[in-house]
Amino acid sequence: MAPSFVSIDTTPDFDMTPTSSKSADSGKRTLLLAPPSIATQEDKLRTLFTTYDRSTTDLQMLDRVSAGFVSLPANTYDLVLVLTGTDGTRRSEALQLLKREVYAAVVPAMKGGAKLQTEDNFFGEAEDREAVLAGLVKKETGFEKMDVGNGAAVPLRLGRKKKAAPAPAPVVQPPPIISSDDNDLNDDELIDEDTLLSADDLKRPIVPPPECQPKAGKRRRACKDCTCGLAAQIEAEDRERREAADKSLNVMKLESDDLNELDFTVQGKTGSCGNCALGDAFRCDGCPFIGLPAFKPGQEVQILNDVAQL
């Protein structure tokens, strides 16, 4: 079977010579996008080409453009007009076919700054969205393709930053040498602290500040860095109490020899009078054994329930 070839028709669907047309600029071309129903209305077509110059105007059917049967030349048209009828009679049919495939074929065929419009200047929300996604810009009467073809690349000449000169290294100064010979200090310049207070100042009682006063139920304490004299006063009072306690202990303190004199349980030791073990008749008035029976020297004496046990 011989292979089949598919050819794409790039010629306009209609080639009618208008009886009269408006004068148009030969440099500008117009693309008319018509719904399929207009092909059956010959009077509409004749009226259409009396308005637009056929030499600068191309007519294509929306269904053929949407199906990809028509290949449009790139960057050719200054105006793309969708034939919806001036009164909107064919709006529903035309906008129903104005889909993304139509925008994909029409937008590349538009020149920079070309316009996309309808006869009644109406676009639905879906058509607006598809036009913006295709790269067109919303205008008052339709959409416009931005003219970016005349742009030229302009090199940016950025001034190079001048390299800052390195900061000079700081000069390290040797540390100053401190010598005792430089200090010409005399004893005459020193002040004796004791001479700053008079005799009356020394007699005055030390009054601690209110914050140093002890709280109720608590012992008076001085601060660690006390400068009001409270710490010295408390230390002096504690020292006096210790000295008084030591004196009271020294009154009752006995030497080892004194203990041996009174300890009659030690063999060979007797009292100063030597008669403590003989009985009350032979004991002194201050003898600690008064009231006890006679016992042998060295015999152990125990006190049980305030009763001497021999």
UniProtKB/Swiss-Prot annotation:
Chain spans, region Linker: 155-202
Motif Cx2C motif 2, chain ranges: 284-287
Region N-terminal SAM-like domain: start-end pairs: 24-154
Pfam families membership: CIAPIN1, DRE2_N
Binding site for [4Fe-4S] cluster: 273, 276, 284, 287
UniProt keyword annotation of Mitochondrion present: yes
Motif (Cx2C motif 1): 273-276
GO molecular function: 2 iron, 2 sulfur cluster binding; 4 iron, 4 sulfur cluster binding; electron transfer activity; metal ion binding
Major place of residence: cytoplasm
Biased composition regions of type Pro residues, renumbered to the chain: 167-177
Keywords for the protein's UniProt record, in alphabetical order: 2Fe-2S, 4Fe-4S, Cytoplasm, Iron, Iron-sulfur, Metal-binding, Mitochondrion
Disulfide bonds: none
PANTHER family from the UniProt entry: ANAMORSIN (PTHR13273:SF14)
Domain free text: The C-terminal domain binds 2 Fe-S clusters but is otherwise mostly in an intrinsically disordered conformation. The N-terminal domain has structural similarity with S-adenosyl-L-methionine-dependent methyltransferases, but does not bind S-adenosyl-L-methionine. It is required for correct assembly of the 2 Fe-S clusters.
Protein name: Fe-S cluster assembly protein dre2
Organism: Emericella nidulans (strain FGSC A4 / ATCC 38163 / CBS 112.46 / NRRL 194 / M139) (Aspergillus nidulans)
